[in-house]
Swiss-Prot record:
<feature type="binding site" description="in other chain">
    <location>
        <position position="319"/>
    </location>
    <ligand>
        <name>IMP</name>
    </ligand>
</feature>
<keyword id="KW-0547">Nucleotide-binding</keyword>
<dbReference type="GO" id="GO:0046040">
    <property type="term" value="P:IMP metabolic process"/>
</dbReference>
<dbReference type="GO" id="GO:0004019">
    <property type="term" value="F:adenylosuccinate synthase activity"/>
</dbReference>
<feature type="binding site" description="in other chain">
    <location>
        <position position="137"/>
    </location>
    <ligand>
        <name>IMP</name>
    </ligand>
</feature>
<feature type="binding site">
    <location>
        <begin position="347"/>
        <end position="349"/>
    </location>
    <ligand>
        <name>GTP</name>
    </ligand>
</feature>
<feature type="active site" description="Proton acceptor">
    <location>
        <position position="21"/>
    </location>
</feature>
<feature type="binding site">
    <location>
        <position position="48"/>
    </location>
    <ligand>
        <name>Mg(2+)</name>
    </ligand>
</feature>
<dbReference type="InterPro" id="IPR042111">
    <property type="entry name" value="Adenylosuccinate_synth_dom3"/>
</dbReference>
<dbReference type="Pfam" id="PF00709">
    <property type="entry name" value="Adenylsucc_synt"/>
</dbReference>
<dbReference type="GO" id="GO:0005525">
    <property type="term" value="F:GTP binding"/>
</dbReference>
<comment type="pathway">
    <text>Purine metabolism; AMP biosynthesis via de novo pathway; AMP from IMP: step 1/2.</text>
</comment>
<keyword id="KW-0479">Metal-binding</keyword>
<dbReference type="GO" id="GO:0044208">
    <property type="term" value="P:'de novo' AMP biosynthetic process"/>
</dbReference>
<dbReference type="InterPro" id="IPR001114">
    <property type="entry name" value="Adenylosuccinate_synthetase"/>
</dbReference>
<feature type="binding site">
    <location>
        <begin position="429"/>
        <end position="431"/>
    </location>
    <ligand>
        <name>GTP</name>
    </ligand>
</feature>
<comment type="similarity">
    <text>Belongs to the adenylosuccinate synthetase family.</text>
</comment>
Amino acid sequence: MSAPAVSQGRNVVVIGTQWGDEGKGKIVDWLTDHAQGVVRFQGGHNAGHTLIIGGKKTILRLIPSGIMRDGVACYIGNGVVLSPEALFKEIDELESAGVQVQNRLRISEATNLILPYHVAIDKAREAKRGAAKIGTTGRGIGPAYEDKVARRGLRVQDLFDPAYFAERLRENLDFHNFVLTQYLNHPALDFQQTLDEMLSYAGRLAPMVTDVSAELFAANAAGKNLMFEGAQGTLLDIDHGTYPFVTSSNCVAGNAAAGAGVGPGQLHYILGITKAYCTRVGSGPFPSELYDADNPARQDPIGVRLANVGKEFGSVTGRPRRTGWLDAAALRRAIQINGVSGLCMTKLDVLDGLETLKLCVGYMLDGKQIDILPRGSDAVARCQPIYEEFPGWNTSTFGLKEWDALPQTAQAYLKRVEEVAGIPIAMISTGPDRDETILLRHPYKD
């Protein structure tokens, strides 16, 4: 037997290094000028990627950001959990705006489905937790991953065998209805209604369903470049994030291999996205936090300014994001976990006009100084940030496209981030439009 073909294309993984919302969508869109395919490998429609193209705003939740580039193939890998209802809503919105989707989107047959009972359980659990809620989006992501790990999940491929799907659905619904009615005080879901709804999606899904793993291998062997688009961020990773205030999937670069069905040797460059400051949505520790709309004790004027100027509201939930200074110690943890090759800093322009900037370079934890984010949310919550201060700049960086055009103080700040992080900054985003970007090192070329 001959050996498998060696990958001829170059592949880039784009991941968030913070708590999500780093601006990955715009960067993926920008880089797909050099890619022929973009792959989602984890998460569901709980992640919103916002793109501004020609002044027009588009929010993508499930479909890869490459869909906004003509001719780019888009893939949903086996590591994603898929809501057909949410998918078709997104497809219809895009196609009504003139974007071709269904003939360019490929969905892994092994992708697990989000069913109505997953959504019901997600919402009912959060309501029951009250003040101790995790801060899920209530879209069924977590319960769908639970079923996957428990080996009772239903996959896309199961929709094409109605008898088998009905049998498995009845078993699952018996289990989940017991949880809903006996523990979560929620009405039971109807079997026939759920079955009819799910099977109604099969016909429209069928042309898009394929062996994504095999298609990606073939594309690479033919010399095509691929982009693996992460959702959420490293600090929300189920294993490496501030557990239990995390999402339900692995958001780190290594999961691009498992979640898309490619070998780890096919991940050639890891681009880590970080804002010039930090944000977080929902509950959980945040050492460099300045502002939380729901916490009267966290109302620092600079944090409020970051939220307002940066328009920090969740693209999916609409919830106000908490804001704080850039945390380089947390960034260092993310770089190590992901094996980041280069950084892209986004929203630098939001810092314009600040008299003084602060950069968290470490923490005091239980009387000891540490220089990397610790494991576990309890330890993170006890961290007191150690800051370095930098002079700000009064001139605008918005829309700049060359390094030399940046103010000297902005350059000094960025160089210090590089020093503390230990890796180079490859790109700087200076605005929401795809062209408002400073390129220092090209992930597909350097």
